[in-house]
């Protein structure tokens, strides 16, 4: 259907003269008069249409002029503030400008509504609407309708488009809610599968270390972070000396006394009968120590080695005599002779110390409430034991080679870069060998 915006009626639309019962001259005069009236009517309609057109143009021009004036009023203060803004940006660093608080700009966009109203209906549409026939009288059927609906609504519904728009918006809203519900269910399902499948287990970590003094292998097993302390397992190596065993199992037998003071005497006094003092034997209730274990706890600088005295409940035991420093071959033989363990009856108490040297302090005794197992022996270095054993001329047991498990070598993937690097290395080796052969020929 074509909507005519501006309609110009024909000359004969509004002028239908009655020509019946008139003569020829009267008919001609009547037609000329009606035609002139029709032309004048058309000119009138043209003037009305032109007036409406130019009025609309004037209104539009007026609106544009108002917008331009409003925009000009907003631009004038900006033009005045441009020089000051340029000076500020020229004299201020970017960091200073970024550190200051800034305001967010929001454009004031007013929303317009009520675009389609009765007042905004064009005249051509009103003309067509006025020409339409009125609806039939269907109110008589309303008592027979269900749910109290109007029967005229089935014939014509002015709210049809509004109802359709509301139904479409509700449908879109339901679809959006359904998609959101599906995404949430898929996310929860994926999270549940992840919790069921991916169960991370804590791997036990094993740390292997070696004691720098004794060469003992120490294995630390760390099973989980919840344990209070890691389990430490000591695995003795073949290179450990026998004195380490004595040091662990002989702590509850006796305790080594502090080193005796060394008196500096003349060479004539070094070979006196007092220096040939034989130390008392170890206690009988202890196990017989090995020859190598009797040299522990002695510094390498002393020429005469004294075994530790036995622990006794008698507090009146005299302290051991002081030893003198000597360096002869006879003293070395004497120390070798005295180093052998003696298992015999208890010997008489030792003679008093010589008057030339002060008496050493008495050895520490065990407390009344504690036993001998609470006292720990003095730690001795493996180097001093080895040096003293060499000085005594004892046969040392050859240490076995300590084997450490090597990690399996992983096969490296060959690529083009590795092959080229190997070729360059081989080429360099061949060139150097050729240069050496040439030099040997010239020689």
From Swiss-Prot:
Q: Name one GO cellular component term.
A: pseudopodium
- Which Gene3D superfamilies does this UniProt record tie to the protein? 1.20.5.340, 6.10.280.150
Q: Tell me which UniProt keywords the record has, alphabetically.
A: Actin-binding, Cell projection, Coiled coil, Cytoplasm, Cytoskeleton, Phagocytosis
Bias-annotated ranges (Pro residues): 306-323, 346-365
Report the domain of life of the source organism: Eukaryota
Skewed-composition ranges (Low complexity): 263-277, 285-305
What effect does gene inactivation have here? Answer: Amoeba grow as very small cells in suspension culture. They have reduced levels of F-actin staining during vegetative growth, and abnormal cell morphology and actin distribution during chemotaxis.
Task: Give me the ranges of the annotated region Disordered.
Answer: 176-197, 220-386
What positions belong to coiled-coil segments?
166-201
| Main subcellular location | cytoplasm
Which portions of the sequence form the region Interaction with brk1 and abiA? 1-96
Location of the WH2 domain: 382-399
Q: Where is the composition biased (Basic residues)?
A: 178-192
Which parts of the chain span the membrane according to its record? none
**What family is reported?**
Belongs to the SCAR/WAVE family.
UniProt protein name: Protein SCAR
The source organism is: Dictyostelium discoideum (Social amoeba)
Gene, per the UniProt record: scrA
